[in-house]
């Protein structure tokens, strides 16, 4: 790991945090309910700013001006959301679609094969290919934003994926050159430490940017190397993807807007459940919840990376993850509903 880069990122983050708190600007209390449900502290949403300022260290595509401009447009959109300049979830969604479409169109980073016969037939059409790619990236970006509600959850998850990709690189497996993960990991580690101690959040700006970069990298990797199963890519991104898709379906089921945040995501239910068991400060419970989730995902990805080219194994891992997620969710939401019903009768 690049120790120098780690300390530089850490120092810059501390300086920015001091400035933001001094100016009472860009703090977590300006965020949505999914950002502050476990904490009422004035924590700077500076993670995305750090990732953007340090991007020249880990992004390898700066020669493509339009690509870089559009990529950082997603950060700026998240930034405007964080400071409540764009409060409409629908408007943010429309702008996300336009930005992602531009990136996909100008970079030619497209999903062309899934090993699902019917879907691959439609993907032979270029227009459908673009629409499907935009949809998938959109799901990941917003899924990353959802899971960022718990300390270390998204940053830790991205570190795990980064380590898995470095492992493939060390084994000589051909992957995308879009991101230098050997430089990104120390930056993420610096953010992880501050996030662990509740001193920094990614905010919408950071979660949007990470979701976009990891999506583009993994799609590009599969374009470059067909020996990597497309289901391995899904395995790496299953958690934010399924979190978002599951959230959309459950909100529609209960006649709620899919684009509005709430506190019924799995990580939030786990937090509330742990809170009932342990009478600790919310800060400790928040971080502990993120560690539990990341430990599970670490085991899942360690297994998946050993069989990166075996589609059958990847499908089994995905099915197990989704089944386990659903069972845990149903159990915890049932307890929450039951408790609400009991309280309403009093």
Kindly give the residue locations of the regions a language model identified.
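Membrane-interface starts of transmembrane alpha-helices
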Residues: 88-92, 125, 203, 281-292, ...
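Alpha-helical transmembrane segments and their membrane-interface junctions
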Residues: 54-59, 286-308
